[in-house]
Regions:
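Bacterial Sec-dependent N-terminal signal peptides
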Residues: 1-21
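Glycine/tyrosine- and acidic-biased, solvent-exposed loop/turn segments at the edges of beta-strands
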Residues: 15-234
Length: 234
């Protein structure tokens, strides 16, 4: 009797196996596919191919077994992506165009709180970018920690850093990824702590330092990133 029940079970499993991981006459992947890590029984992905092209939803797995990412292939050029932390919460979500990141991408902490909003064009950061102070519970308000402009993947334009009270902590300008011009740094109460110029990411010129309590200030002159000391003072 046991042998009688084994026959249909084998038949079912065999039929199922024939419905996945098939190739068309051109040798291209066709239909449902399940991929595995090399030299392993651990699943790497599940999805559907149409004449070698991924179509619809693909689920990708980490070697440890949890879901790494979910990709929805909208057409030949556009796909929506969700990436996951190992605890199952979303780590990042956004869109690809021609296999390059495009538009807004949202980055989240393991606790499911927003950390960044990045904007891409043809795979490079472009436009206004945001980084947020980490949140640890639902009662905290989401507050910007850093805001800056990008061009071609590099910081280019106004850059600002904020404290948790929402006040500007520091600000200045970047040109092609390097600090350029006067940068100003503030105490928590909003008064100036120090300010001075950069040239191609290096301190150059007179820097002023304030104690935050009086109008007194100290001045240091920098040359190529080094404090300038007159010969008479050496």
């Amino acid at each position: 009797m046991k042998w009688i029940f084994c026959i249909p079970l084998f038949f079912i499993l065999n039929c199922f196996a024939q419905d996945v991981n098939k190739l068309n006459k051109a040798g291209e992947k066709q239909g449902s596919w399940t991929g595995y890590y090399e030299n392993s029984y651990s699943k790497r992905y599940q999805g559907y191919f149409d004449n070698g092209k991924p179509t619809g939803r693909f689920t990708y797995y980490a070697l440890e077994g949890h879901i790494n990412s979910i990709v929805d292939f909208i057409n030949d050029s556009i796909s929506d992506v969700q990436m996951f932390h190992d605890n199952g919460t979303i780590m990042a979500e956004g869109k690809y165009l021609n296999k390059l990141k495009t538009g807004k991408w949202f980055i989240y902490s393991r606790n499911d709180y927003l950390l960044n909003i990045f904007t891409y064009h043809k795979g490079a950061l472009e436009g206004t970018q945001y980084t947020y102070h980490p949140k640890f519970d639902d009662y905290e308000k989401l507050k910007v920690m850093e805001q800056y402009e990008c061009k071609g993947g590099l910081k280019h334009g106004l850059w600002k850093e904020f404290n948790k009270l929402g006040r500007v902590k520091s600000e200045g300008y970047f040109v092609d990824g390097a600090k350029e011009g006067v940068f100003t740094y503030y105490f928590a109460n909003g008064s100036i702590e120090m300010k001075g110029p950069f040239e191609k990411d290096v301190k150059n010129g007179d820097w002023f330092f304030y104690n935050g309590e009086t109008s007194n200030m100290d001045k240091l002159t920098y040359v190529n990133g080094e404090v300038y000391v007159p010969k008479d003072d050496k």
